[in-house]
Amino acid sequence: MNVNDSQWVARALEQRGFVEKPLEEADVVFINTCSVREKPEQKVYSALGRVHQANPRAVVGVAGCVAQQIGAELMRRHPQVRFVGGADGIAPAPDAFVRLLHEPKLRLSYLDFTDSFPDRDPYLLDAAGQPAQEGVTPVAYVNIMQGCDNFCAYCIVPFTRGPRKSRSTQSVLDECRHWVARGAGDITLLGQNVNVFGKDKYGDGTSFPELLRQVAAIPGLRRIRFVSAHPRDFSQETIDMFAELPQLMPRLHLPLQSGSDSML
């Protein structure tokens, strides 16, 4: 999911006129973080040290789960950091970088969880409002929800990604069609717990199994996958989709840290 977020930010920056450059030549540096890896905070601070050594004049932004945890402390410890964004700070990041380049003293933080899914569809359009002419891609990843309400003892996700929020069905389908039109025959639907898609207050009445049906109906789409699926919320109807939809690959990704009750 973080990789997908980072790729989206890169595309959105390119659509605003940015060009990818080596670290030493960059005007802005975007660091997206993950808090479920070993020693995540130390790795972020190490990365910031390397950036400062290589390019002390660059505008640096830090986003993702570690940014959500540490917050404004990142700016205090590293003055070069001028943007901090949590899970809901990804969407405003591209426009924030444009502002930061034009306002040298400005610092921005987006650490509050928004009251709706932070949709990014407008960034798939060019300046004329037409679909952006991105390159052909055989595989695509589409966010359908984010956050989690399960609060498992071993998991930090509810604190770093916030409460669960479903994206609108139409928005999901529009992005899937966008990628299929650009050559994607294989789409993975992303979320911290895709099984509860549509069941929160942001849902529009479409369940996850029904969403799978609608995505599978898109002409040209050959394979569908999804991650992650919490076993507590896995319904029989979702299981039945593996038999009903030939496009749905026989693959499950479950957020299991251990099979031992005593260990958990």
Set out the residue ranges of the language-model regions.
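Conserved SAM/AdoMet-binding glycine-rich loop
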Residues: 60-64, 69, 181-264
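Proteins enriched for Cys/Gly/acidic motifs involved in redox and nucleic-acid/cofactor modification
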Residues: 1-198, 242, 248, 252
